[in-house]
A protein has these predicted regions:
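Conserved S-adenosyl-L-methionine
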Residues: 164-174
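A short glycine-rich, Lys/Arg-flanked "PGG" loop and its adjoining helix->strand segment in the class I
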Residues: 110-125
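A structural helix-start
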Residues: 66, 106-110, 130
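Conserved N-terminal segment of class I S-adenosyl-L-methionine
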Residues: 1-92, 96-100, 113, 192-193, ...
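Short, glycine-/aromatic-enriched active-site segment of Class I SAM-dependent methyltransferases
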Residues: 10-11, 126-148, 152-160, 183
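Residues lining the SAM
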Residues: 100-103, 129
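A C-terminal cap/extension of S-adenosyl-L-methionine-dependent methyltransferases
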Residues: 173-231
Length: 231
């Protein structure tokens, strides 16, 4: 992702309905986990890293590019630069790895999963969120440097090949999928943009309602997986 997109994302992250809901989902996944050492891969604006810290985790952000690392430091995060397929960490040093909207940027996602397995302690948790459904592929994906969108089957296969057991897999951003599909048909680039506050509030209400509806097995715009390192 270009530096301008990284900074745009960081500016949007605090209030944008999509990022707020993603932080809520992360917080939900942390319930029941004993806090320890965590790595947030692709931290960008640092919202997820702050969620980890707020829940008692000793969290470090990882960014590939200089611009992303600079943004993370400006926001008060402990950050290291590195490649998700060659993490600058020792074996079995972490209890949790978070990779939200990361794998879709990496040509060799098998290598990224294997690296997460290497740095996790036996029984450690790998939380992964990715864009779902190749049918939604559009100019937006190209603009933000995606190389793929995932299905449940191929995401599960990547993680299982990497040495993980799938503990849960769910869709999210389900209710708005028809709107996203329609908009992406005429997309000419990234849809990362600041929204009218009223529109943002309305979309936030829709995505919040999704928490209370049994739709997590329906087709959505994104997938969220909780996986555990097999010993």
């Amino acid at each position: 992702m270009e530096g301008t997109e990284v900074r745009k994302l960081a500016q949007l992250e605090d209030a944008h309905w999509w990022y707020r809901e993603r932080r809520h989902l992360l917080a939900g996944q942390l319930r029941g986990l004993l806090p320890g050492r965590a790595l947030d891969i692709g931290a960008a604006g640092g919202g997820n890293t702050r969620v980890l810290r707020d829940h008692g985790w000793d969290a470090v952000a990882l960014e590939y590019g200089a611009e992303g690392a600079e943004v993370a430091r400006e926001r008060g995060l402990t950050v290291i630069r590195g490649d998700a397929t060659r993490l600058p960490l020792t074996d079995a040093c972490l209890d949790l790895v978070v990779a939200f909207d990361v794998l879709e940027h990496i040509p060799d996602d098998d290598a990224a999963a294997a690296e997460a397995h290497r740095v996790l302690r036996p029984g450690g948790t790998y939380l992964v969120a990715v864009p779902a459904d190749p049918r939604l592929w559009s100019e937006h994906d190209l603009a933000v440097d995606h190389v793929r969108r995932y299905t449940r089957a191929n995401l599960s296969a990547v993680l299982e090949r990497g040495g993980f057991a799938i503990r849960s897999i769910r869709s999210w951003n389900v209710l708005l999928r028809p709107v996203v599909a329609l908009r992406r048909r005429s997309s000419t680039g990234s849809d990362l943009e600041e929204l009218n506050p009223v529109v943002n509030l309305g979309l936030r209400a829709v995505i919040t309602a999704e928490r209370y509806l049994p739709v997590d097995r329906w087709p959505g715009v994104s997938l969220l997986v909780r996986a555990q390192r097999r010993d």
